[in-house]
């Protein structure tokens, strides 16, 4: 089976990111083909099981000129709370993810 996992957060940070990474590992052990779309900062590194296709959405760039989105008031990395996004930021966010998702599928 081909599985695409998507998160706007960093894949190796926070509970949901670690959960995503471990889920991808479990799917890989079962022989499934994995791909991941995730938000990352310019200096982030990622490690997934061999054969996993990774499609990063780069924050802190001209296209997304703010830190990775986060779901909590306090994250273990510099982040942008969804509730603090302006309409322009939300549009940039949606556009960036749409472009990467089209490549992934």
Language-model features: locations:
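A conserved catalytic-core segment of Leloir-type glycosyltransferases
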Residues: 35-104
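N-terminal subdomain of nucleotide-sugar transferases
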Residues: 1-58
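Hydrophobic, Leu/Ile/Phe/Ala-enriched alpha-helical segments that form helix-helix packing faces
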Residues: 23, 27, 100-105
